[in-house]
Amino acid sequence: MAAWAGFSEEELRKLQHNGEVANQAVSVTLGRGRKPAQTNRSRQQLQRERALQLAAKQKEISQSLLPDQQLTRPPEPPASSHPAPPAETPDEQSVPVKHEAEPVKPDPASPVQSIPPADFKELDKQEVELREKNRLQQLQWEQRIMEEKNKKRKALLTKTIAEKSKQTQAEAIKLKKIQRELQVLDDSVSSDIGVLRKLIEQSSMDYSLAWKRFEKAEAEYVAAKMDLHRKTEVKEQLTEHLCAIIQQNELRKARKLEELMLQLELNAEEVPSPDQTQLQDKQKEPVTENGPAAELERCTEANGSSMSKDSSITETKISQDNQESEAADVSADGLR
C-alpha cells in the first residue's frame, strides 16, 4: 500500500466517463421496449459473463499487483428482495452495452420469462441504484484510502522535517563550536602578535639608540685619532726644532771655543817682562775687564738670549698648537 500513490486525474476522468456511458446504456435499454423473455435471458447471461469477467480481471490484477498495492473489497450492501448483481469496475461498465446490443435467442426452458415488463423495469431501476451505490461506496473507499495515504505522507513528511531540523540544529551547534574555537585561536594569535610587535618596537628603539651611540663613538674616535695625529706631528716638529736648536747652540759653542783658544794661543806667544806686564796690566785693566771673560760673558749672554728667544719661539709654537688642539676639540664637541 505504501508504493501505490492513488488514482491520477486521468484515471478519475476515465472512471467518470465510464459511469456516464453505463448510465446512458441502461437508459437506452430501458427505453427500447425489449421483450421480457429476451431481456430476462440476456440479464442472466450478462450476470454470468460479468461474473466470469470480474473473476478473470481480479485474478489478473492480483497477479500483476503487489500484495501491498491490492485493494480490499468494499462492504457488501444489505440484502434486498431480488438478488443484486456483483459490483462492477469502471472497465466492466462499458461491457454491458456491447452484450445488450447483441441479439439473444429466447430460452423456453428459462423460468424468468414469466416476469412482467413492469417488474423488470423496477428491477433495472434497483440495479442502477445498486450500481450507483456501489460506485459511490467505491469512490468513498478510494477517498478514504487516499486520505489515509495523505495522512501517512504528512506524517512521514513531518517526521523527515523534524529529522532534518534536528540535523540542522546539530550542524548549527557544531558550526558555533567551530566558530568559538576559531575565535579563541584568533584571539591567542592576535595577543601573540601584539606582544611580538611591542618587542619589535622596543628592539628597534634600542637598535636606533645603539646606532646613534656607535655613530657618536665613531665620530669621537675619528676626532681623537685626528687630534692624536696632529699632536704627534706637533711633537715631532717640536722635537726636531729642539734638536736643531741644540745642534746650532753646540756649533756656536764650538766656534766660540775655537776663537777663544786661538786668542789664548796668541797671548801665550807674546810673553812680556814683569815691568811690561805690570804696565800692560795697568794699562790693560779695562781691557782685561773687557777681555776674554767679558767676551765669554757676552757669548753666554748671547747664547742665553738666543736660548730664551728659541724657548720663547717654542713656547709660542706650543701655545699655538695647544690652541689649535683646543679648537679641534671644541669643533668635535659641537659635531657631537
From Swiss-Prot:
One of its GO terms (cellular component) is Golgi apparatus. Residues 61-72, 302-322 have a biased composition (Polar residues). Its main location: cytoplasm. Transmembrane segments: none annotated. Residues 213-271 form a coiled coil. InterPro entries: GORAB. GO terms for biological process: non-motile cilium assembly. It is found in: Cytoplasm; Golgi apparatus. The keyword Cell inner membrane does not apply. Keywords: Coiled coil, Cytoplasm, Golgi apparatus. Residues 26-118, 268-336 are annotated as: Disordered. It comes from the Eukaryota. The keyword ATP-binding does not apply. Residues 74-88 have a biased composition (Pro residues). Belongs to the GORAB family. This is RAB6-interacting golgin.
